[in-house]
Amino acid sequence: MGVGAHHDAPECGMENVEWRMKTGTDTVRAHHDAPTSHTESTPQGPIMRIVSLLPSATEIVCALGLEKELVGVTHECDFPPFVRQLPKVTRTLIPTEASSRAIDELVRERLTTQRALYSLDLPNLEALKPDLIVTQALCDVCAVAEEEVRAAACLLPGTPKVINLEPQTLTEVLASIQQVGAAVGISSHADNIVAQLTARVEAVSARTAGLQHRPRVALLEWLDPPFSCGHWSPELVRLAGGVEGLGKEGQPSRTLRWEEVLSWNPEGVLIACCGFDIERTLEDVPALWKVPGWLDSAACRSGQVYVVDGSQYFSRPGPRLVDSLEMLAHALHPETHPLPDGLDPAFRIAVPHF
């Protein structure tokens, strides 16, 4: 389902609601430590109390210049940095300190038995008195389920408006910014933000148009077990001048066998584990060297294996997805794509030689 496929008004009238979660200046660049800057004029929309239930929505709200209207966020919202101080209305029920294999097994088991991955703090949500709640229905693993949020909204005073973000592609990610802008009455301002982001995407695409060689790329969203990338990420690889042969544009990520990865023989590997920063991802990397045939892959032989902050970038469908594109383009074609000021490069791993 695409962006805006669900109605804004929560479907109320339910009785005996069971709380079960079946399971994120003129140039917009969100990798600074201050709240994202916005265009010339401050958006003039109605004062609202906004609660964001996914990190990408939090970044969208702030990119639109609505930092002061944001009153509540999730336990995972961490950018811009000031949002870490806002009241939290969710918590995870999965031990994040567990191994990647254990996390994967726990998530699969809970989804199979329809047990919660997250809990929603209804008393805190009620105390925040939101006018607008931004949620998602894209991924059962990434955030509180949309139907759970709509059920909660029906129990809150005033029945706040609920909007659902469900982007599958980069175009739909940018459209979700306009969706939030329309919900708060600043459509024109949102259009300006999207135009700026689109110009950056087009600049990358223009530079890749004349490339003589597009390397085979494996963008991995998990390592144990390995997962392909999905949704917008294969599109990012294409726009950055690569070819993604394991993930499909606009489709969910999927579990892989290492034999599949090695059969693709990627010339470049980008590891962007969903929900993990670089430090946490690096804990899993040594196991790669033990995968039979891995060190003989084209990427390892040429030293083109990178780790990025998957939590902050590639798996967060907000304004910084364009940063992700620029980061990826620089990693694949550094001479063609200079790294923009203020954006850290992908971390290149030293491949061991046994």
Go through the PLM ranges and name each one.
Residues 1-9, 14:
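Extreme N-terminal basic, low-complexity initiation segments
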Residues 2, 16, 27, 44, ...:
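Detector for intrinsically disordered, low-structure N-terminal pre-sequences
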